[in-house]
């Protein structure tokens, strides 16, 4: 959606290509209502305008799409858009998952260009090898309207409320090693051992603890019976994943995050937009919140204590940093970069 709006703001004629059929419908959304949408059958059979670039975010460009587009314009470019850390996730999928789902090195994967989010530059050579095409960065952009709409729909009024003993929330997806709750859990255990009076509760929002297909019984037993949680059974909760607006509203927490080669994250911007303390290890967001290096548990614990003791005092500084970062990743601030990306694609 944001890529569509960014391209539109740059002056390009943009449309969504809709593959919906009787079995697969395009998800309705208020922000799509006023967008140009062309059904696949119409695009294939009767759409006669020249298409210069087809962006494929999160999906593969199948042969039919490529052939159809090239027939309309032999110079058109099919562009794979990678917003995920495919290098790490594919290693995990290929080696450790029973169901093997990863990019295959076959001619069907071929595209004309690849764009990747800036924090996935480490995978540049990987993308170029599997897609057999040149690659470049796509600007990272964010807009608050999505979480604002979600909060409005739920009837929430969001905004951090200072507390002497705040809650902590961890909201990592745990889909692969790049964003997990592992280090935050260990840090929270350390905090409860050494400074139990500094926080109220900690909530780990992680579906893996509720997935019937994954046997977490030994982990649950260890946490409940062989760690400091045994002394604080009503202070650490393992809940299913929830909408981030729900977490902000119901827990009013310090957001505690850990990432591994996944340093740009919408929840960081959402947390700072609503004024929440953020404990994180993302170099790109170093100016906001409380930053710890890599896997440093001791520093992460110190950051939590720093947030508890000093966030209210330093609130104006955090607001200034938040404003600068939110501006940095806005569509308006990235118009030039978007145009430069289009130029790179066309000239490749």
Model-found features: residue ranges?
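Catalytic core of nucleotide-activated saccharide and alditol-phosphate transferases
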Residues: 69-165
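Conserved catalytic-core segment of nucleotide-activated headgroup transferases in glycan assembly
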Residues: 121-235
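C-terminal alpha-helical cap of glycosyltransferases
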Residues: 327-348
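Extended catalytic core of nucleotide-activated donor transferases of GT-like folds
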Residues: 1-110, 237-244
